[in-house]
Every structure is written in C-alpha cells, then in structure tokens.
Amino acid sequence: MYEDGLSFLEEERDAFRPFEALLELTDEQLEQPLDGAHGWTGRDLMAHLGVWIERWLEVAKELAVNPQSPAFDELMALEKDWAAKGDELNAQYQAEWASLPMAEVRRRFSTWPGELRGYLTVVPETRWLKESGHLKSLLGNTTEHYADHEPELRAILAASGR
C-alpha cells in the first residue's frame, strides 16, 4: 500500500489537518451537543479521536525499541470485543475526557498526532509499515478513523459558523 513510511506520514498529516479546526473553536462551541454529530460535542469528537491516537502512540513507543508491543496486543483485544463493548468503551472514554480541563483536552489533541508521527519516524518500517497487522490497525485508528468522522466534524464546524 505504501512504499515508504513518509508516504503514510504525509497522508495521515493531510487527513488530520481538517480536525485541527476544532482547536480554533471556543470552549463554549466545543461543549455544544449536536444532532448531526450523534449528539456529540466538539470535545467528544476530540476525545474519541484522541483516545485511539494515544493508543497507537503507546504502540509506536514500544515498537521503537522492541519488535513486539504489549500495547498493540491490548489494542487487538479491545478490537476483538468491539462489537460487544464498543458503545460502553466509547462512553467510558468520553467520560474520562469530559473530566479533563479543556486546556488539557486541547493540549492532547494538538500534540499527540504529531508525537505519533514523530515516533513512527524512528520505528523500523518492518515493524509497522511492512507488518500487515500493525499497519491495518494503524490505518483503522488514524486515516480511516478520521474519514469515518468527517460528517461529525462538518456538523460541529457548521454549527459554529465555520
């Protein structure tokens, strides 16, 4: 799919860029629930994407120094049970992020994607780009996941007049 890691990193960067518009919204705009976004707020969308970026950031940190990643194994266990527990987990993650100060939500959302890209530059490509299970999970938690949530992003931005 990708000839080199840089190709993925550029695609991921481009795919995430539209979501950075959430950082330009006021705290009040980020807290406004919307029907067109499954009742989510901008904060909820930031949390939802952030959780999975964070999980892959942990995987990348481990893969940078070892060929195996316990964090990846945990992620695979979550994905295996997703059909049964996905809504429950999403609600849990949403509640965890709702308890954070908005400044922390913004910090995580603005820094973790870049940190993930940075770590992936030092992970040997054989451990993520050329390893089909890792690549499939990475895509599912980044570029494909972003695409899945573009409708919510559009609704949130439209409600804020953007």
Residue ranges of predicted features:
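Short, contiguous alpha-helical
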Residues: 31-84, 118-162
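Hydrophobic packing residues in well-ordered alpha-helices of helical domains and bundles
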Residues: 5-12, 42, 102-109, 135, ...
